[in-house]
């Protein structure tokens, strides 16, 4: 729902699937002046077989972690990706997000997102957990088992819900950059140690992809021809007035050359 408007601005058509009728109504009201949006209410596993379109992009933002409930079966997360894969157009991509089960903040005293308890993911989920997060190796394994052989990992920081910076394997954070670690607005937490100093050591040891708080993954059945310039880093400076709020991207071409690009976040900044 939250992404529908921005996707509609960039795509010819957008299809939304929501289980909550209230969420569907809110989404429809919010986007009533936009064209090309279809909103379905109901269980994904019941709606997906009846979708006749093929999609260039499929977004599972927060949905993948809920796969056990969405696709009750022996291998629910793989089956969810397999179902989404069947809806892809040739060359299409699936974008999914997940909190990292081994994210540094969970060691440092943050509650687990879905159980509300401490260290649940680190110690291993029980069978009763309907939602769960994943480590990077777990994500890689289930994505490949679903038949999506090519994947690119990105690392939203502090997390994918309220990211201020997005890193990639081609542009990882540097020592001293990860200092904004107290953005847990929804639950109380402990402060077990200085996360900034811990991140500095993790970065120095080359382990940031293991302990990043969140993942954003772009997956394909097979690698298509790469874009001439691919964004490998984005930083949002939108805590300013709308006139001065910008996004800074670092793009990389096939030869490894890097280019900086600045984009206004709001129409006022484009004037």
Where are these regions (language model features)?
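Short alpha-helix
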Residues: 128-155
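C-terminal lobe and adjacent flexible extensions of AdoMet/dcAdoMet transferase-like proteins
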Residues: 166-270
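Conserved class I S-adenosyl-L-methionine
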Residues: 95-118
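A short acidic, Gly/Pro-enriched loop at the edge of an enzyme's catalytic core
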Residues: 48-58
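A short SAM/SAH-binding and catalytic strip from SAM-dependent methyltransferases
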Residues: 56-75
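A short glycine-rich, Lys/Arg-flanked "PGG" loop and its adjoining helix->strand segment in the class I
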Residues: 73-93
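Conserved SAM-binding loop of SAM-dependent methyltransferases across substrates and taxa
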Residues: 1-12
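Conserved SAM-binding strand-loop segment of SAM-dependent methyltransferases
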Residues: 32-46
């Amino acid at each position: 729902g939250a992404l529908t408007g921005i996707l509609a601005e960039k795509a010819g058509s957008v299809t939304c699937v929501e289980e909550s009728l209230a969420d569907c109504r809110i989404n429809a009201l919010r986007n009533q002046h936009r064209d090309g949006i279809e909103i379905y209410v109901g269980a994904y596993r019941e709606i997906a077989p009846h979708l006749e379109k093929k999609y260039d992009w499929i977004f599972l933002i927060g949905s993948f972690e809920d796969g056990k409930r969405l696709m009750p079966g022996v291998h629910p997360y793989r089956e969810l990706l397999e179902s989404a894969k069947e809806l892809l157009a040739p060359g299409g991509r699936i974008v999914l997000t997940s909190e990292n089960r081994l994210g540094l903040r969970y060691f440092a005293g943050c509650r687990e997102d879905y159980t509300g308890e401490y260290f649940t993911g680190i110690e291993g989920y029980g069978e009763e957990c309907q939602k769960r997060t994943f480590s990077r190796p777990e994500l890689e394994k289930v994505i490949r088992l679903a038949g999506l052989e090519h994947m690119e990992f990105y690392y939203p920081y502090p997390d994918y819900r309220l990211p201020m910076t997005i890193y990639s394997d081609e542009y990882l954070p540097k020592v001293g950059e990860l200092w904004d670690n107290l953005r847990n607005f929804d639950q109380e937490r402990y402060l077990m140690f200085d996360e900034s100093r811990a991140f500095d050591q993790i970065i120095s040891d080359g382990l940031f992809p293991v302990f990043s708080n969140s993942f954003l993954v772009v997956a394909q059945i097979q690698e298509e021809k790469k874009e001439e310039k691919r964004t490998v880093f984005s930083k949002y400076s939108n805590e300013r007035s709308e006139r001065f709020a910008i996004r800074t991207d670092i793009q990389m071409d096939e030869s490894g050359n890097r280019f900086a690009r600045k984009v206004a976040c709001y129409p006022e900044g484009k004037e």
